[in-house]
């Protein structure tokens, strides 16, 4: 059997990080088992689904690098209405579904009664049964189509995350599978799609647990082999509440990109939300695929921890090739009005500073003074700069100007003799030198920084 999983987002605004984690676990499960990972766009909500939202999903999947095996044949539910109608007709013909002519008022009365009695909402008055007389069909009413849910027994499944789950069928409604205008409903479309796509493992959020028995019963009615189900726990915010844009939480995957998070780090972090491999916190996707198993996913909710996300991101920045980092940092430097990054070469700059940043925006800031001297903070000036320091910098500039070989080692060799002559400690040279050349007291080794900026530019800045 070829393992087939799917990710089935609804294009109604943005790609949620909870959805990305679901996609990640589905993707990793398929890759671990040498199977297929498929994408389906559940766009039947015509009022909310837009082409722009579809592109947001596709762009988000591309950004995080979750490649799907049906890239040339992504399934869109709105293109499958004929297929849904075909299956509905089959269910009606075989007696697994029926027409219901209830009015909104009747359904509301049933709902109120069911709430009081704790029973299923719909009283099945239009359900055909042996020896039962159905009401007279009202004039001018377009019926819905309902599925005939089994009246006795239980629907059970061995959930790959939550364990054994069983729901008494008497607690389930005869759900509507086609509205009065003929359009199919969510739970029905999902079943037909999973069946036609050959999905073997449905991995999704645990907000779908209540949908599962309904979908299992429909699958049985159409004669399908049941997939296995795994329901993932919710991701909570740092306060332990449901993540919500309204609460100020970052929820869209694209927002994390704007925050300077690498896609590899985002996936690494999301993988650790609910799944563990011993004490391993930092790993590559190749390692994750090798290690991943749904049995290691906790059924309990996970809590966001932005500090940990940034730490993981910093670790990924350290191992990212400088050439790749340069392509990610250049646009951020352009936003800071730095467009020329050849002198010094940005890759060389990144090699020196990338250990100092946990996100790409901070990394871009760390590169600025290599190209343009920054304005020192008042605190740095008060602490490290005075007339004596200014005069000392001019004297040290003469030593620098005399260097024939401009490199970090040669620059470093000037420090001790100069400090001895001046009767100062290294801090009295290094800190003012950083301010004079870079405009900040916080830099890597000052000899390496000066070597990269270049002799002509260093002397110009000191003497400005």
From Swiss-Prot:
CDD domains documented for this protein: GluRS_core
Protein name: Glutamate--tRNA ligase
Disulfide bonds, paired cysteine numbers: none
Binding site for ATP: 245
Family statement: Belongs to the class-I aminoacyl-tRNA synthetase family. Glutamate--tRNA ligase type 1 subfamily.
Organism superkingdom: Bacteria
MF annotations from Gene Ontology: ATP binding; glutamate-tRNA ligase activity; tRNA binding; zinc ion binding
Motif ('KMSKS' region): 242-246
One cellular component (GO) term of this entry: cytosol
Organism field: Neisseria meningitidis serogroup A / serotype 4A (strain DSM 15465 / Z2491)
Enzyme class (EC, first level): ligase
Lineage summary: Bacteria, Pseudomonadati, Pseudomonadota, Betaproteobacteria, Neisseriales
Key word DNA-binding present: no
Recorded catalytic activity of this chain's protein: tRNA(Glu) + L-glutamate + ATP = L-glutamyl-tRNA(Glu) + AMP + diphosphate
UniProt subunit comment: Monomer.
Biological process terms in GO annotation: glutamyl-tRNA aminoacylation
Localization terms from the record: Cytoplasm
Gene that encodes it: gltX
Positions occupied by motif 'HIGH' region: 9-19
PANTHER family: GLUTAMATE--TRNA LIGASE, GLUTAMATE--TRNA LIGASE, MITOCHONDRIAL-RELATED
Pfam families named among the record's database cross-references: Anticodon_2 (PF19269), tRNA-synt_1c (PF00749)
Reported function: Catalyzes the attachment of glutamate to tRNA(Glu) in a two-step reaction: glutamate is first activated by ATP to form Glu-AMP and then transferred to the acceptor end of tRNA(Glu).
EC number(s) stated in the UniProt entry for this protein: 6.1.1.17
Alphabetized Gene3D superfamilies for the sequence: 1.10.10.350, HUPs
Keyword terms of this UniProt record: Aminoacyl-tRNA synthetase, ATP-binding, Cytoplasm, Ligase, Nucleotide-binding, Protein biosynthesis
């Amino acid at each position: 059997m070829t393992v087939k999983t799917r990710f089935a987002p609804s294009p109604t605004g943005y790609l949620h990080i909870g959805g990305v984690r679901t996609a990640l676990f589905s993707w990793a499960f398929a890759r671990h088992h040498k199977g297929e990972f498929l994408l389906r766009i559940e766009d039947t909500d015509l009022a909310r689904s837009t082409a722009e939202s579809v592109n947001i999903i596709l762009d988000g999947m591309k950004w995080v690098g979750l490649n799907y095996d049906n890239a040339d044949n992504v399934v869109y539910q709105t293109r499958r209405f004929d297929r849904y109608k075909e299956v509905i007709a089959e269910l009606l013909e075989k007696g697994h579904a029926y027409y219901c002519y209830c009015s909104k008022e009747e359904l509301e009365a049933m709902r109120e009664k069911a709430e009081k009695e704790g029973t299923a909402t719909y009283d099945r008055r239009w359900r055909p049964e042996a020896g039962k007389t159905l009401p007279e069909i009202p004039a001018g009413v377009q019926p819905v189509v309902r599925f005939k849910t089994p009246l006795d027994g239980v629907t059970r499944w061995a959930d790959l995350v939550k364990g054994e789950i069983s729901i008494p069928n008497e607690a389930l409604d005869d759900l509507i599978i086609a509205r009065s205008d003929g359009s199919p409903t969510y739970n029905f479309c999902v079943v037909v799609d999973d069946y036609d796509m050959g999905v073997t493992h449905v991995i999704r959020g645990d907000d779908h647990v209540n949908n599962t028995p309904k979908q299992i019963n429909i699958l049985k009615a159409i004669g399908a082999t049941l997939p296995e189900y795994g329901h993932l726990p919710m991701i909570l915010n740092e306060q332990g509440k449901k993540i919500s844009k309204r609460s100020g939480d970052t929820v869209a995957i694209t927002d994390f990109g704007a925050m300077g998070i690498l896609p590899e780090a985002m996936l690494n972090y999301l993988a650790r939300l609910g799944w563990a491999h011993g004490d391993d916190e930092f790993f590559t996707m190749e390692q994750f695929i090798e290690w991943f198993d749904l049995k290691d996913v906790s059924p309990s909710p996970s809590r966001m921890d932005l500090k940990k996300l940034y730490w993981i991101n910093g670790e990924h920045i350290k191992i990212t090739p400088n050439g790749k980092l340069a392509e990610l940092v250049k646009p951020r430097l352009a936003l800071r009005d730095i467009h020329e990054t050849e002198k010094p070469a940005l890759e060389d700059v990144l090699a020196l500073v990338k250990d100092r940043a946990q996100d790409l925006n901070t990394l871009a800031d760390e590169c600025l003074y290599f190209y343009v001297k920054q304005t020192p903070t008042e605190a740095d000036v008060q602490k490290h700069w005075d007339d004596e320091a200014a005069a000392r910098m001019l004297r040290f500039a003469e030593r620098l100007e005399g260097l024939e070989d401009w490199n970090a080692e040669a620059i470093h060799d000037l420090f001790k003799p100069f400090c001895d002559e001046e009767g100062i400690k290294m801090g009295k040279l290094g800190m003012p030198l950083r301010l004079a050349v870079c405009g900040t007291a916080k830099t890597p080794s000052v000899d390496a920084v000066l070597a990269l900026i270049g002799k002509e530019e260093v002397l110009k800045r000191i003497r400005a």
